[in-house]
Amino acid sequence: MPSIVIVGAQWGDEGKGKIIDYLAQEADVVIRAQGGNNAGHTVMVEDKKYSFHLLPSGVLFEDKLNIIGNGVVFDPEGFLQEIEVLKKEGINTSNIKIDERVHVIFPYHKRIDQLEEEARGEAQIGTTKKGIGPCYMDKIQRSGIRLGEMIDEEDFKDRLYKQVDDKNKIIEKIYEAEGFEKEAMYETYLKYAREIKKYVTDTTILAHEALKAKKKVLFEGAQGTLLDIDLGTYPYVTSSHPTAGGFPIGAGIGPNQIEQVLGIVKAYTTRVGSGTFPTELDNEVGDKIRIKGNEFGTTTGRPRRCGWFDGVMVRYTTRINGLTAMSLMLLDVLSGFDTLKICTGYELEGEMVAHFPANIKTLGKCKPIYEELPGWEEDITNMKTYEELPENAKKYIERIESYVGVPIKMISVGPKRNQTIIRERLF
C-alpha cells in the first residue's frame, strides 16, 4: 500500500507541482483533497510550461487516474477551461474523476469574496477572490450545492434559485452592489453540468480500491501548512486544511492508509498577501531572490514577499504534519550569494524563543536569530547527483536537515523535471 502525501511546509508556492509531477511518473493514482482553484501549480515538461489551478498534476500522464476528492471546492468554469487546454494539446482527459460530494463555486461566491475583501479596507487578508471562503462557508452552514446535486437536473433549478435569492439579499442590501439574474446563471451552469457529468462519481470508492490493491497513490497538496484554517497564521489563512491531517477527510480514506508525508520547502521563504513574516527581506537581497526565483504568484501574478529560510517555522510544520521526509526546492536560486542565513530561533522581548507562536501578534514581535553559512558561486542547474554539489551547498542542506530533524530526500536545482537530485527514492 505505497501512499505518499505531499504537503507544502511553508506558506504555499513551495514548488509542489514539480515534485508531484516528478513522482506522478511512478504513481498509479493522483488525488487532490482540499482547496480549490485559488492555488496554482506549475509543471515543466521539456520546454512546455503548464499551469494548473484545479486539476491534479498527474493529468499529463494518460495512464494515471486523477481524482478531485470530496474536500475540494469546485469551480466548473475553471475546470472546463483547464480541460480545454489539455484537449488542445491532444491530452486525453478520460482519466479525470471528480467526487460527487465536492461543493460547487458559483458567481455569487466570487462576488461576495470580492465585496467582503474590499469592505475590510486596510485589514484585508489577501484573498484571491476566487470564492473559496464563501463556498466553504455555505458548506459549513449546510446550504451549499454539491456537484452531485448540480448534475441532477430535476433538483438543481430549485436549489440554485433559492441560493441566488439569498445571496442577492446580501450583495444588494449589505454591500449595495448588483445581484445576479437567476435564469441566466441556471442556463450557464446547467450547460456546465452536462459537460462535466461524465467525470463525476464516488471517488472514495476508487481511492479505497487503489489502496487495497497496493497501487501507488500520490496525495497532492495545495497551498501550504501555514495557510491551514486551524494551524496556520490565522486570520491570514485559507478556508481548508492543507496539512497532512486534511487528506484522509478530503479524500475519504482512513488515516492509517497514509504511509509517508513529504514536506515541500523552498531553500528560502516566500509569502503572497498579508500577514507577519519574520525573515522577510524588504531590501535588495529580497529583490534578488524574487527576480532569480521568478517569485510571482501563479494564480494572481502578485510579487511574492521573499526572505531567508525560517527553520523555526519549518520545524513547526514538520511536527504538525508528521513529516517523514522533505524536498528542498529552488536551491539553484541561492547560487551567487556570498553569505546565506538560516533562522534558528526568535528573539521575543529580549528572550530567545525556539517555537513558532500560535498568535500572530506575538509572531509579529519576533525577530529572527540567524546562523550564517558561506554561499557558493557555482551554477548547479545541471548537476545530477548530491556528490556533484558544491561543498557549501551540501553544508547548507545538511544544516537544514539537522535543525529540522527530517531527511531531505529530493533537491530541485531547476524548473524542469530532470533538474531533480534524488538522494533516496520514495516510491
UniProtKB/Swiss-Prot annotation:
The protein's role, per its UniProt record: Plays an important role in the de novo pathway of purine nucleotide biosynthesis. Catalyzes the first committed step in the biosynthesis of AMP from IMP.
Catalytic activity: IMP + L-aspartate + GTP = N(6)-(1,2-dicarboxyethyl)-AMP + GDP + phosphate + 2 H(+)
Binding site for GTP: 12-18, 40-42, 304, 330-332, 412-414
Record family assignment: Belongs to the adenylosuccinate synthetase family.
Cofactor info, note text: Binds 1 Mg(2+) ion per subunit.
Pfam families: Adenylsucc_synt
HAMAP family the UniProt entry points to: Adenylosucc_synth
One Gene Ontology molecular-function label: GTP binding
Protein's pathway: Purine metabolism; AMP biosynthesis via de novo pathway; AMP from IMP: step 1/2
Active site, UniProt feature: 13, 41
Name of this protein: Adenylosuccinate synthetase
EC number(s) per entry: 6.3.4.4
InterPro entries found in the cross-reference section: Adenylosuccin_syn_GTP-bd (IPR018220), Adenylosuccin_syn_Lys_AS (IPR033128), Adenylosuccinate_synth_dom1 (IPR042109), Adenylosuccinate_synth_dom2 (IPR042110), Adenylosuccinate_synth_dom3 (IPR042111), Adenylosuccinate_synthetase (IPR001114), P-loop_NTPase (IPR027417)
Annotated positions binding IMP: 13-16, 38-41, 128, 142, 223, 238, 302
PROSITE patterns found in the cross-reference section: ADENYLOSUCCIN_SYN_1, ADENYLOSUCCIN_SYN_2
Alphabetically ordered keywords of this record: Cytoplasm, GTP-binding, Ligase, Magnesium, Metal-binding, Nucleotide-binding, Purine biosynthesis
Gene3D superfamilies per the UniProt record, alphabetical: Adenylosuccinate Synthetase, subunit A, domain 1 (3.40.440.10), Adenylosuccinate Synthetase, subunit A, domain 2 (1.10.300.10), Adenylosuccinate Synthetase, subunit A, domain 3 (3.90.170.10)
List of residues binding Mg(2+): 13, 40
GO CC list: cytoplasm
